[in-house]
Curated annotation (Swiss-Prot):
InterPro entries, alphabetized: C4_dicarb_transport, Na-dicarboxylate_symporter, Na-dicarboxylate_symporter_CS, Na:dicarbo_symporter_sf
Protein name (database record): C4-dicarboxylate transport protein
Keywords: Cell inner membrane, Cell membrane, Membrane, Symport, Transmembrane, Transmembrane helix, Transport
Xref: PROSITE patterns: NA_DICARBOXYL_SYMP_1, NA_DICARBOXYL_SYMP_2
Organism: Rhizobium johnstonii (strain DSM 114642 / LMG 32736 / 3841)
Membrane topology: Multi-pass membrane protein
Principal cellular location given in the protein's record: membrane
Any GO molecular function: fumarate transmembrane transporter activity
TM spans (from-to): 17-37, 57-77, 92-112, 139-159, 161-181, 201-221, 234-254, 320-340, 368-388
């Protein structure tokens, strides 16, 4: 009589109540934050420290996660030329799809024309509203961005939490470990042993995700209000629909060609997506995404190189936003851009977008950098979208995250560093017929 109930209890142990899942908690927190911010806006704006504190907690652990993942991954490579190949293929992928995202934003803006008919006089715009963003944009330069990748000190790179500086040192340190050979085994073993508690710490910190998402969303709705969305609903709707189609159609086609389902991938990283939705920062999900991609069958060396690099060089959502928003401003202020002007805008955006970090508001600063170089579109026109940029930030961050997840799997497969059986198991068996490895085109 006792055995049956005990068996039933044992079977039920494998299934956690739905409310204990992180994604359910984050989703509920986002909904609660929206309601609180709408009905009690003053109180909602006071909850901003909750979101800021959570993002700081995550940033605290990003540098150790990148260092351990990259250094141990490269140290375990028998062929150091693979490091160059992985980096080269990743940059080729980033350049291709980042440019495609910019072009799609340009095409959609010309077809839909979300700013047409607003007839705003550029002289009536207040340049002081965006002066801070413009100043930050002028501080950016291609040469400065590239030289800034090299840290002044190793400690400084980790203390500042600069992703590219930490990645730069981690790659060099991993190569040094691999070149030393057997003598470096104690160091490699120590770093491998350190990886487990660091990722356990990530899991512990993620328990606070619902609190962070609640505070960030309550602040956003409380400060900007739902009403600010309605004023520029055409632009917001166009951007969200374009980004969704980019993920489902463009990235979906890439995923299908490389043997997996984009829908299954979205389901697999749903906790990271909801975390980004709540905080508007794709950086908040970086440690979790790296862990998930490794569990999905991508070798650690590929994950460690592709994802951190992608956070500066593979921002599909930010790229769609940049060309779409630039043309919206031109249309709203009655400025007719020739195809030559639009091509110039595209070329400038291709360069300026490469320095955008995965933090809240980086897309707006990058847009300012682009417009400051293109004389046809007034930088002051950014004041038109300043109030709604926070609502578009979520979509940018979500699209960026999915783009980097797809890129990791594709590059891993190109390098034959992908365990397809493990990927199928992680995605719930939702994989398709695998195209030939080596690139986007079938091997001849």
């Amino acid at each position: 009589m006792i055995a049956a109930p005990l068996d039933a209890v044992a079977d039920s142990k494998g299934k956690k109540p739905f409310y204990t899942h992180l994604y359910v908690q984050v989703l509920a927190a986002i909904a609660a934050g929206i309601l609180l911010g709408h009905f009690y806006p003053e109180f909602g704006t006071q909850l901003k420290p909750l979101g800021d504190a959570f993002i700081k907690l995550v940033k605290m652990i990003i540098a150790p996660v990148i260092f351990l993942t990259v250094a141990t991954g490269i140290a375990g490579m028998s062929d150091l030329q693979k490091v160059g190949r992985v980096a080269g293929k990743a940059m080729l992928y980033f350049l291709t799809f980042s440019t495609l995202a910019l072009i799609i934003g340009l095409i959609v803006a010309n077809v839909v024309q979300p700013g047409a008919g607003m007839n705003i006089d550029p002289a009536s715009l207040d340049p002081a509203a965006v002066a801070g963003y413009a100043a930050k944009a002028h501080e950016q330069s291609i040469v400065g961005f590239l030289t800034n990748i090299i840290p002044t000190t190793i400690v400084g790179a980790f203390a500042d939490g600069d992703i590219l500086q930490v990645l730069f040192f981690s790659v060099l340190f991993g190569i040094a470990l691999a070149m030393v050979g057997e003598k470096s085994e104690p160091v490699v073993n120590f770093l491998n042993a350190l990886t487990a508690p660091v990722f356990k710490l990530v899991a512990i910190l993620m328990k606070a995700a619902p609190i962070g998402a609640f505070g960030a969303m309550a602040f956003t709705i409380g400060k900007y209000g739902v009403g600010s969305i309605a004023n520029l609903a055409m632009l917001i709707g166009t951007f969200y629909i374009t980004s969704l189609l980019f993920v489902l159609v463009v990235l979906g086609a890439v995923a299908r060609y490389n043997g997996f389902s984009i829908v299954a991938l979205l389901r697999y990283i749903k906790e990271e997506l909801l975390l980004v939705l709540g905080t508007s920062s794709s950086e908040a999900a970086l440690p979790g995404l790296m862990n998930k991609m490794e569990k999905a069958g991508c070798k650690r060396s590929v994950v460690g190189l592709v994802i951190p690099t992608g956070y500066s060089f593979n921002l599909d959502g930010t790229n769609i936003y940049m060309t779409l928003a630039a043309l919206f401003i031109a249309q709203a202020t009655g400025i007719q851009l020739s195809w030559g002007d639009q091509i110039l805008l595209l070329l400038v955006a291709m360069l300026s977008s490469k320095g955008a970090a995965g933090i809240t508001g980086a897309g707006f600063i990058t847009l300012a950098a682009t417009l400051s170089v293109v004389p046809s579109v007034p930088v002051a026109g950014m004041a038109l979208i300043l109030g709604i940029d926070r609502f578009m930030s979520e979509c940018r961050a979500l699209t960026n995250l999915v783009g980097n997840a797809v890129a990791t799997i594709v590059v891993a497969r190109w390098e034959n560093e992908l365990d397809t059986a493990q990927l199928a198991a992680a995605l719930g068996g939702q994989t398709g017929e695998m195209a030939p490895a080596g690139g986007l085109q079938p091997a001849e």
